């Protein structure tokens, strides 16, 4: 099982993770199953966790440690679709793992804040974007950010799995 090899390597490099090894494996399995089933990951947090959300999405939507080139079939389709740009697109595009940071979308966020309830903006986005089989990842330094917790409630009601990252003491 290659997953266990990676987990052992991770915990040997970062011994503090040994205490949450089972949680790390469970989070990995949730994400793996989401992507295997054609789902997407939606991520949110506040302040520094907002920046973390955007960063994680950036790594998922393009290659990270390894480049993820498009398939030969898609490269051929690009070249057929646009003789001028297809070759360049095929060489530059990378296979992404579908992910959305719920922390952007300024128009929606400010409209919902003004018209409804700003603490529920992540919940509203999950309700609109999410489907059963997707994953919501909530990031919080305290572990009890109310806007993230509203989103967790919507996720649970919608059959969206949740992964929580508490980044604090």
Model features per residue range: what roles?
Residues 40-57:
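Glycine/serine-rich anion-binding loops at beta->alpha junctions
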Residues 55-169:
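Glycine-rich phosphate-binding loops that contact phosphosugars or nucleotide phosphates
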Residues 20-24, 49, 156:
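Residue-level recognition of alpha-helical structural elements
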Residues 1-19:
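Generic N-terminal amphipathic, Lys/Arg-enriched alpha-helix
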Residues 17, 31-34, 129, 155:
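Hydrophobic helix-cap positions at the C-terminus of alpha-helices
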Residues 19-37:
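A short, well-structured juxtamembrane/interface segment
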């Amino acid at each position: 099982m290659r997953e266990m090899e990676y987990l052992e390597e991770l915990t040997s490099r970062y011994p503090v993770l040994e205490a949450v090894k089972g949680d790390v494996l469970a989070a990995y399995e949730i994400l793996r199953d989401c992507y295997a089933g054609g789902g997407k990951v939606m991520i949110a947090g506040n302040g520094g966790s907002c920046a973390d959300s955007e960063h994680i999405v950036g790594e998922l939507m393009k290659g990270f440690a390894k480049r993820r080139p498009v398939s030969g079939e898609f490269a051929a389709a690009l070249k057929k679709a646009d003789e001028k740009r297809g070759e360049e697109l095929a060489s530059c595009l990378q296979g992404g793992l579908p992910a959305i940071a719920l922390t952007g979308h300024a128009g929606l966020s400010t409209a919902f804040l003004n018209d409804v309830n700003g603490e529920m903006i992540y919940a509203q986005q999950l309700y609109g974007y999410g489907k059963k089989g997707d994953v919501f990842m909530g990031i919080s330094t305290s572990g009890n950010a109310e806007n993230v917790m509203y989103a967790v409630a919507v996720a649970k009601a919608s059959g969206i799995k949740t992964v929580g990252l508490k980044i604090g003491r």
